[in-house]
Amino acid sequence: MVIYALDASAILRYLDGEAGAELIKQIIKGHLAGKHRVVVSAIHWGEVAGIVCKRHGRGGMDAALSRLSAFGFEIVAVTANRAVNSALIKVERKIPYADAFGVDLAGDSAEHVLVTADFDVKAAEEDVRIEFLPPKPKH
């Protein structure tokens, strides 16, 4: 069974209705139908919370997290081992630390696929399966 690891950029694209939101909707529908699973690193969950709170205030954040929680995504805790693995990924692949948690999560099995709009993780493409969302249109 495919396990989609959504990072903060993928979730924000969904919430904002931006490029790639339709793909995320399809992934969520498949998850709800039991066709595949969706996991999110606690780091990315917190990143979504912070960005939504900054944009829309505490009430907006609470509403968005409630909406997302209803989907039943598995929020994967940050353990000491994951923190160290992510640090190694950051150093070896020269990607931002928070993004490294998505790469680490996608490395849990061959069934995992990282879904992201963040092209900083391209350096890890040879290590894990990554599905990149389309770039935002330039205005």
Feature locations, PLM:
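Active-site neighborhoods of divalent-metal-dependent phosphate/nucleic-acid chemistry enzymes
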Residues: 74-113, 117
